[in-house]
UniProtKB/Swiss-Prot annotation:
One of its GO terms (cellular component) is cytosol. CDD domains: DOPA_deC_like. GO terms for molecular function: aromatic-L-amino-acid decarboxylase activity; glutamate decarboxylase activity; pyridoxal phosphate binding. Converts internalized glutamate to GABA and increases the internal pH. Involved in glutamate-dependent acid resistance. This is Glutamate decarboxylase.
Amino acid sequence: MLYGKENRDEAEFLEPIFGSESEQVDLPKYKLAQQSIEPRVAYQLVQDEMLDEGNARLNLATFCQTYMEPEAVKLMSQTLEKNAIDKSEYPRTTEIENRCVNMIADLWNASEKEKFMGTSTIGSSEACMLGGMAMKFSWRKRAEKLGLDINAKKPNLVISSGYQVCWEKFCIYWDIEMREVPMDKEHMSINLDKVMDYVDEYTIGVVGIMGITYTGRYDDIKALDNLIEEYNKQTDYKVYIHVDAASGGLYAPFVEPELEWDFRLKNVISINTSGHKYGLVYPGVGWVLWRDKKYLPEELIFKVSYLGGELPTMAINFSHSASQLIGQYYNFVRYGFDGYKAIHERTHKVAMFLAKEIEKTGMFEIMNDGSQLPIVCYKLKEDSNRGWNLYDLADRLLMKGWQVPAYPLPKNLENEIIQRLVIRADFGMNMAFNYVQDMQEAIEALNKAHILYHEEPENKTYGFTH
């Protein structure tokens, strides 16, 4: 969010710290205070400002990790001050990043015959930007070599309308036409019957999504790869796939290792993921890998002289703390393959349980039951004849602390209002039982309430987060 003068409150107030007049201070809001205050007082003031915020553990809107072990937190707190970009000053941190890239490449079945490359980012949004830039630059080289007039029209990117907002940003920032393949009731992921209709010689690439933000569904990347392969056989203007696996990239390899969506597929040339989602690290850390260095244009790799050393870097951001990299490596060391598998399978069971319990109420149609990503989505049945809607239900659940988003589906399905539960590693079966009980009580209260009917349905977004 961007902030400006209109975001300011009208007044500032004197705040006593637990009734002590001697520690009564002016809480600064929009201008620095003239004088310093004691650290204990500053701590209490800032802590009090956050008293009425939601409990992150009860936030079922976010994909982001909301719990890490104390040992991980300790390691991360010990490395907060380290700038991960200072490769020469912190060589062990650099090696840890390299190990993480190699471990992820192995999970994604990178071939020993190819020379994969990858880097950390501060999240999947940056990783998507880098993957998109590589596709654009590579397309431009191929197009110029084939004699295509690259200035005749905008290059384009093909993606499902269930895309994450970072792709819209990418297309705006780098002047790319976004070609959205519409979702519909029969196609809640990329429509394989229509996707190739959007591809032409100006297409820089096709994005497949492993975990659509709205519903948690996977695009069928293997089927998409087959379509791209057939297309490439018929033209000199080759097209390749970038997989946005922000959510699924560190989930699917453990829960569905036989599912082919990664570098096992010939035309998948790059993949991104979020370490702070199902990689189980606090925000924010992301990863992007290319199957071979030939898919990463040299002009996007910078060699920077910095504090006595020369380093190759490919990032939009520069300075960032090493702590999230350390947290990711801790998790890889701590859990190993079997540990991640056990955690994610448990999360999967919780999601499936919730879907069944919600369906038992008889009022909801399950849009996604958590059988892929542990995301449960549902809408009110069309014949429910209730005086309340999902926004009302979200309000009632919030009274118990549960933050549950209600929102319309993307273009072409915007009249479908759904709720989404993102089940994370720290959401166990006991919490699931509590949620079901609170949901049942909320429904009972709404059924008994004298509700002022909504004159017009408002397809707003309530508590939705990517």
